[in-house]
A protein has these predicted regions:
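Non-catalytic pre-domain segments flanking phosphatase-related domains
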Residues: 1-37
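Metal-dependent phosphoesterase signature
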Residues: 27, 31-59
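Anion (oxyanion) recognition and catalysis
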Residues: 29, 66-70, 121, 153
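Short coil/turn segments at beta-strand junctions that form active-site/ligand-binding loops
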Residues: 31-33, 72-73, 123-127
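Short acidic, S/G/P-rich loop/turn micro-motifs used as interaction or catalytic elements
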Residues: 42-45, 49-50, 81-83, 134-137
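Short, acidic loop-to-helix structural element flanking the phosphoryl-transfer center
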Residues: 49-75, 85-89, 110, 115-118
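Structural beta-sheet core signal
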Residues: 76-78, 129
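C-terminal cap/substrate-recognition subdomain and adjoining C-terminal extension
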Residues: 85-170
C-alpha cells in the first residue's frame, strides 16, 4: 500500500513541479541564461547527513551559484523527498539565497530532471547544468547514473558533472 501511495503521490509531485518549472522557463524567453544546480553532493555535502538543515555546504560551489545568479536565472533541481521542502528552502535561505531569487524544483528521481532540461534546451535558452548525478555516497562506493548522464549529454546544454567541479568541493 505504501508503494502505491508513493507512486501516486510522487507522480503528482513530478507533474506539479515539471509544469510549474516549464512555465517559468518559457516565460524567460530565448537567449536568456539559465543555470540548474543539484543540491545533494553538488552544492551540499549531504553524505551521512541526518538533518538537512544542518548540512554543510561546499563554500566554493555556493560562491559559484551566487556568481551564476548575477548572469541569469538559477533553478535548484533535487530528487529529495517532498516532505523536506521546508527544510530545504530554509537551508538555501540560510546560505544566502533570498526567497524569490531562485526556483526550487523537487522531483522523484534524477531521470525526471531531463524533462525540465529538455524544455529549456529546446526553447533557445543558454543552459548550464551542474549535477554530480551519483548515488551510494553513504556506502563509500560512489556510483554514477550513467544512463541519465548520457541523456543529459545528448541535450544542447553545457553539462558540468562531478569530475568538472570536484575541485570546488573542498
Amino acid at each position: 500500500m505504501k508503494k502505491v501511495l508513493k507512486k501516486l503521490f510522487g507522480g503528482f509531485v513530478d507533474d506539479y513541479f515539471i509544469s510549474n518549472a516549464s512555465k517559468k522557463i518559457l516565460s524567460l524567453g530565448p537567449s536568456n541564461k539559465i543555470f540548474f544546480f543539484d543540491i545533494d553532493n553538488t552544492i551540499a555535502d549531504t553524505q551521512g547527513a541526518k538533518h538537512l538543515t544542518l548540512v554543510k555546504e561546499f563554500p566554493l560551489m555556493i560562491d559559484l551559484v551566487k556568481e551564476k545568479a548575477q548572469e541569469g536565472k538559477v533553478f535548484f533541481l533535487t530528487a529529495r523527498n517532498i516532505t523536506t521542502f521546508p527544510s530545504t528552502m530554509q537551508w538555501l535561505v540560510k546560505k544566502g539565497f533570498g526567497k524569490g531569487s531562485f526556483e526550487l524544483i523537487f522531483l522523484t528521481t534524477p531521470a525526471k530532471k531531463i524533462k525540465i532540461l529538455h524544455t529549456a534546451a529546446t526553447h533557445g535558452l543558454d543552459v548550464e547544468y551542474y549535477d554530480d548525478l551519483c548515488y551510494n555516497h553513504e556506502y563509500g562506493e560512489i556510483k554514477k547514473y550513467d544512463q541519465v548522464i548520457n541523456e543529459v549529454k545528448s541535450l544542447k546544454i553545457r553539462y558540468k558533472g562531478i569530475d568538472d567541479f570536484r575541485h570546488l568541493q573542498q
